[in-house]
UniProtKB/Swiss-Prot annotation:
A translational regulator that binds mRNA to regulate translation initiation and/or mRNA stability. Usually binds in the 5'-UTR at or near the Shine-Dalgarno sequence preventing ribosome-binding, thus repressing translation. Its main target seems to be the major flagellin gene, while its function is anatagonized by FliW. The keyword rRNA processing does not apply. Homodimer; the beta-strands of each monomer intercalate to form a hydrophobic core, while the alpha-helices form wings that extend away from the core. This is Translational regulator CsrA. Belongs to the CsrA/RsmA family. GO terms for molecular function: mRNA 5'-UTR binding. It comes from Alkaliphilus oremlandii (strain OhILAs). GO terms for cellular component: cytosol. Keywords: Bacterial flagellum biogenesis, Cytoplasm, Repressor, RNA-binding, Translation regulation. It is found in: Cytoplasm. The keyword Repressor applies. One of its GO terms (biological process) is mRNA catabolic process.
């Protein structure tokens, strides 16, 4: 893991088109801004983990294809 120190209003670049900027530091929290291509998906880690868990759960469910077939006929 690369560890960098930045002050408020300083930034780092990831490649040539992703910039992460420290917008401010207040009450022990760091506020960051991310400038990246529009199509790039960016999530907070806890949200990303939740999405992964939901996808795993959904992939393990047994689907009754007959019920699905009925739904599409409506």
């Amino acid at each position: 893991m690369l560890v960098l120190s930045r002050k408020a209003n300083e930034s780092i670049m990831i490649g040539k088109d992703i910039e992460i900027k420290v917008l401010g530091i207040e009450d022990g929290k760091v506020k960051i801004g991310i400038d990246a291509p529009r199509g790039l998906e960016i999530y907070r880690r806890e949200i990303y983990v939740e999405i992964e868990e939901e996808n795993i759960t959904a992939s393990k469910q047994n689907l009754n294809l007959e019920n699905l077939k009925i739904l599409f006929k409506k």
